A protein has these predicted regions:
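Bacterial N-terminal signal peptides that target proteins for export
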Residues: 1-8
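C-terminal motif of bacterial Sec signal peptides marking the signal peptidase cleavage site
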Residues: 15-18
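Residues within mature, well-folded domains
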Residues: 20-162
């Protein structure tokens, strides 16, 4: 393949991938067209207005989770990237549950256990102000959120001796 053909093919692939990204879906798009472009969602949940929410997660490797909300006529109303510190900070200790966390953020990137907490720690990868971070949601054995903590995610060849 000649150089210019390879370049055209690469550009077409990039353009096609960009069109199939949740944030590029246009309001008013029919649900069937969005699902055809994006594939099967991670989760689907009913909305109070008779519509439904499609949740597309890029966890565990990615740092985004998108809510695509559709009205009762199955038309796209909004697209929201929900993996933000503000949304995790809005979780209410002792009130929010495993189910509400799952409905908001989708499945975690990692589920961990530590000696000092009797329950699961759900870890989500996110990007906050271009800084890779992790949100750790502590969920007790009854399925209730007890704490949310944040850590910076160290990526690549980190050398603490530098």
């Amino acid at each position: 393949m000649t150089g210019w053909r390879a370049l055209v093919l690469a550009a077409a692939c990039v353009a096609a991938a960009g069109c199939a990204s949740p944030q590029w879906q246009k309001p008013g798009a029919p649900l069937a067209a969005v699902e055809q472009a994006l594939g099967r969602p991670t989760l689907v949940a009913p909305l109070a207005n008779g519509g439904e929410r499609l949740l597309y997660s890029r966890q565990p490797a990615g740092q985004q989770v998108y809510h695509l909300d559709f009205d009762a006529q199955r038309r796209l109303v909004s697209v929201t990237q929900v993996l933000t510190e503000a949304r995790f900070q809005a979780l209410r200790d002792g009130v929010d549950t495993r189910e509400s966390v799952l409905a908001t953020f989708g499945p975690p990137a990692l589920v961990e256990h530590v000696a000092r907490f009797d329950g699961d720690i759900w870890t989500y990868r996110l990007l906050e102000n271009l800084t890779p971070r992790q949100a750790h949601v502590h969920i007790d054995p009854e399925g209730v959120v007890r704490r949310v903590m944040f850590t910076d995610e160290i990526l690549g060849d980190f050398d603490p001796g530098r």
